[in-house]
Amino acid sequence: MENRSFYNEILTEHNVHPEFKHDLPDADIVLEGVNPNCGDDIWLKLKTDGDTITDGAFVGDGCAISQASADIMLGMIIGKKKEDALKLGDTFIKMIKGEATEDEIEGLEEASALRDISHMPARVKCAVLGWHTLSQALNGKEKK
């Protein structure tokens, strides 16, 4: 129960006081992610230098889970190589599907606060929206 309370605090903090929810006009990778089931809608904006993500932000509206997940994700990927960011995304998706090892989950740091979402099927798409958008953006499906 103590852990669940801690995880709820993490999610609430990232939803109420997101560090990365703002515009990023000079982003060179921009992609919209939409969850039509509940109306979550984010625009992921990344600034890159070669293979490194140097800055990132998101704008949009959605439930607390989608907003917190996107904010946590950006905190994890800024400063990382694109390849490493994609690996984090793959691990996050594995965690949500209940397929990640404890070591992999620990490597997700604050994103592990979303691990129990796997038991809430209606919220899975909310949690993975930012991560799926990241994968699409880094694999060349961005809009300009």
Regions found by a protein language model. Give the residues of each.
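Active-site phosphate/pyrophosphate-handling residues
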Residues: 42, 71, 125
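Short, thiol/selenol-centered motifs that function as redox-active sites or metal-ligating centers
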Residues: 61-67
